[in-house]
Structure formats: structure tokens, C-alpha cells
Amino acid sequence: MHEIGIVSGILKTVIDTARQAGASRVVRVLLRIGDMCEVVPESLDFAWEVFREDDPLTLEAALEVEEVHPRSRCLVCGEEFAHDRFHMRCPACDSGDTHLECGRELDIVSMEIETDD
């Protein structure tokens, strides 16, 4: 369950950033996660609910996830195509020589905070 490590790292970054910004609380965090990261959404949500309570800044913070589906480019014919996690062969020329263009993201896109000011 690598979601625990992912959430732990995300919360550390969020809390550090929120403190530097003078936040009184974190309202919402938006993540972008590619399907190729093999993150289980239910496990991510569970870890978030548990670990966000460790700091008063994130006690009520909502987590939103934007999924990124994999897309690859064929290095033989140049075709760009969407696929699932397991089938990366080019649909145009059937080559297995492809490059993953997106789908491995694991990014904090934004966070909404409140300040006492």
C-alpha cells in the first residue's frame, strides 16, 4: 500500500507550504495522478482521512484527484494514442517501440488555504 507513503509526502509538502504562506488552515488540495502510478483511489482516500488529522492545518482539508489517462507516441510511425496500463502497442503499425507521453504524473496541482488576516 504505497498510498500511505504518497499521502505522507504530500501532506508534508502541503503543511510546509501552508505554514510558509501564513495559513490558518488548508481547505482543499488538488492532485493530478496518472493511471500508470497504480494508485488505488480508495486507499489514497483512506490514508488521507487518517493522516490529515495529524496536523491542525489539515484537519478538515478536502482531497480532490484529477486522473490522467495514459497516452503514448509510437517511435516508429509517430502515432499518438490512448491506452490502458497494459496495452502500449501502437494501434497504427503494431510496434511495441512506444514512449509514454502522459499517465505517470503525481503532482500537487493546487491548494486552497485560509489565513487569519
Task: Cite the ranges covered by each PLM segment.
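Cys/His-enriched microdomains
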Residues: 72, 88, 106
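Flanking scaffold residues of small Cys/His-coordinated metal-binding clusters
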Residues: 68-69, 84-85, 103
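Short functional micro-motifs and their immediate structural scaffolds
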Residues: 82, 95-99
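Extended interfacial segments that mediate partner engagement and assembly in macromolecular machines
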Residues: 2-15, 38-41, 53, 57-64, ...
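Short cysteine-rich clusters marking metal-coordination/redox-active sites
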Residues: 74-77, 90-93
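A broadly conserved sequence feature marking short terminus-proximal activation segments
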Residues: 20-70, 79
